[in-house]
Amino acid sequence: MSFTDDQSPVAEQNKKTPSEGHWFAVQVASGCEKRVKLNLEQRIHTLDVADRILQVEIPKTPIVKIRKDGARVQGEEKIFPGYVLIRMIMDDDAWQVVKNTPHVINFVGSEQKRHYGRGRGHVLPMPLSHGEVERIFRHVDEQEPVVKIDMEIGDHIMVLSGPFKDFEGDVIEVSPERSKLKALLSIFGRETPVELEFTQVEKQN
């Protein structure tokens, strides 16, 4: 049997597949990761393929955002923007369900040349290796919250607390991993580099 352009190219994948399936990466439209996950989970049950499409994940890492007023806001950030990970037992039906989900672009894999005619060939979905899967989910499980701040070198700031309260200066260094920055403050008429906590400063427009 040969496949047309609108059919699945995954016949080669119908080999020995463990009952727990393999993980595949799927490229999706930017900003549509959550929408794809929800749509796909609904389609899995509607189209009765829950025995083959087993899990849909958007790997995320915890972050702490420092707002301009110094408030800390807990949140999450996608590790692989534009991608969704799917654990599945690959066959033609499961491939079609994923591929035809709105905002899905394609599986990550190797492009197969067409045997005839013009145009691009099919992408043969390639499962992630055990090592890749282990690294991804270990990163998710063990990751300490990353501190994000709406601040960069060159920004003008005002100090909100501490001995330099009400001083203003320009940021010359940002250290997110330490939740600190350095700014040049005018002290006794001289510009002096001072290290400050993120929570001690406010960005000035």
Curated annotation (Swiss-Prot):
**TM spans (from-to):** none
**Which residues lie in coiled coils?**
none
Q: Which UniProt keywords apply?
A: Transcription, Transcription antitermination, Transcription regulation, Transcription termination
InterPro entries to which the protein is assigned, alphabetical: KOW, NGN, NGN-like_dom, NGN_dom_sf, NusG-like, Rib_uL2_dom2, Transcrpt_antiterm_NusG, Transcrpt_antiterm_NusG_bac_CS
Q: Which GO annotations describe the biological process of this protein?
A: DNA-templated transcription termination; regulation of DNA-templated transcription elongation; transcription antitermination; transcription elongation-coupled chromatin remodeling
Could you name the Gene Ontology cellular component terms for this entry? cytosol
Q: Which SUPFAM superfamilies match?
A: N-utilization substance G protein NusG, N-terminal domain, Translation proteins SH3-like domain
Gene3D superfamilies attached here?
A: 2.30.30.30, NusG, N-terminal domain
Q: Does the keyword Zinc apply?
A: no
- Show where the KOW domain sits: 154-178
Family as reported in the entry's similarity comment:
Belongs to the NusG family.
Could you tell me what this protein does?
Participates in transcription elongation, termination and antitermination.
Name of this chain's protein = Transcription termination/antitermination protein NusG
Q: Which gene encodes it?
A: nusG
